[in-house]
Amino acid sequence: LLPVFLLIIGSVRAVESPKREIRAVWLTTIYGLDWPKKPATTEAGRKAQQQELCTILDQLADANFNTVFLQVRLRGDVIYRSAIEPASKTFSGKYGTMPGYDPLAFAIEECHKRGMECHAWFVTFPVGTEKAVKEQGKLSVVKRNPKLCKRHNGEWYLDPGVPETADYILSLVKELVNGYDIDGIQFDYIRYPEQAKTFPDKAVHQKYGKSTRLPDWRRENINKMVYRIYDWVKQAKPWVQVSSSPLGKYNRIERVPNAGWTAYESVFQDPKMWMQKGKQDMIVPMMYYLHDNFFPFVDNWVENCNGRLVVPGLGAYRMDKSEADWTVNDITDQIDYSRYYGGAGCTFFRCANVLDNSKGLYNELKDNYYKYPAQLLPLTWLNDRIPDSPEGICVE
């Protein structure tokens, strides 16, 4: 397979830079990986945090990026004002304490000033390590809603099989969408955890789904929640885009039967069904692989997208020598292929791995691949209603 795909790549390098495409980064706030560098306890510290973000956004704007996926819910803690979950300690140094400003509101305003969209990146089911849950104390969802939570491999998760879990997630979504001028909401970890076979939900399955096979029941738990969230968002603010970042390989396809870790089989995630049902605006699969493990899976996503946007997530972090020591060409080959075969753009994990210009990636994007600005793509399925005739207009 590999020589075939390399031959194809050689033939698509001349693709013109699209006039419309998504050019995005995942901007990570957990542990302050991308932002902020340190918590703020003084006015000077707050201003330093804000300036940090402005510098990041300026660099992205200079390279004609047009979308930021900002991590707003980390592990049962958030970076915005919430009546439901505690503020993250990332910004203030203490759970439940805001840093003296609203990081999400500030980020939205600054993105919009630069003509960029700001999507709320929302970690769905993981709610913290034992240490984090203990540190959050009574503020933790594990303490406040123990019925919803399960401990698995030393971490805590909301259990998708408990019906009230969907109610809880939807309450967070409502608070976020109603309270902020976000352009979209993107669901991460909207799946069962790693080593899902040992996830302790047998009793819940017996109570709520014993007539259905466990794998099918698990997938349907997530499906129903996805549909419910999408329908609510489109009723409340139709222009807010709903997306997810599933595993990069949907299932074991004929072209790559030994695909390994997949969304459908391994973590009971069925994003193709979500698209077929029209319950996603965009799918952003985490495709941190090379060659045979990348190219055919791009095809697979695009072939099954039902007209929705497919935005491959590229592993810029894999260029690090401590990771996989990828080359710049490894990344640009993936951009070329995605453009040629129907992708709606690309996003990079993570922001700092682009802006630090590792192996010249930032310069390559700024000077070549993103040399000219690109508009975002129209969401045509949201505009299929004929507008009402204007009323109350008189011509003198």
Give residue ranges: language-model regions:
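Catalytic domains of carbohydrate-active enzymes, especially glycoside hydrolases
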Residues: 48-77, 179-182
